[in-house]
Amino acid sequence: MFIGEYQHSLDSKNRMIVPAKLREDLGEMFVITKGLDGCIYAYTINEWRILENKLKTLPLTNKDARAFVRFFFSGACIVDLDKQGRGLIPQNLKEYAGIEKDIVSIGVLSRVEIWSREKWINYNESDIDYDLIAEKMNDLGI
């Protein structure tokens, strides 16, 4: 399970130093892809396989299902960390997430989200009504 918030930067070669705590759970090789809300999702190889198997069951006849699978898989790539715990974020994902240098990685249960620091600050300053969200979660039995 991934938890916590970590602030760090890309180096001159677009490599992210994965924080030690996240590296322990992500492993030396993991998958990153376009996430929702303008961030990048990172999954362990095992968690990616589970997700992949779930998405395989979506009906090809459903337009929204096809669109989501295309969105999710077209940006996916495997990150292989070097001995210093650095991994390359490809240009297309950097552009998608608006990442220039400063990033924030957050643990969100089964995945890590990688945000540009600016987008993360803006997200946290937005008018999110957490009390209303909590009520909706209660309606779902959570």
Swiss-Prot record:
It is found in: Cytoplasm, Nucleoid. Its main location: cytoplasm. InterPro entries: MraZ, MraZ_C, MraZ_dom, MraZ_N, MraZ_sf, SpoVT-AbrB_dom, SpoVT-AbrB_sf. GO terms for molecular function: DNA-binding transcription factor activity; transcription cis-regulatory region binding. GO terms for biological process: negative regulation of DNA-templated transcription initiation. Keywords: Cytoplasm, DNA-binding, Repeat, Transcription, Transcription regulation. PROSITE patterns: SPOVT_ABRB. Pfam families: MraZ. The keyword Repeat applies. Residues 5-47, 76-119 form the SpoVT-AbrB domain. One of its GO terms (cellular component) is cytoplasm. The keyword Transcription regulation applies. Forms oligomers. Belongs to the MraZ family. This is Transcriptional regulator MraZ. The gene is mraZ.
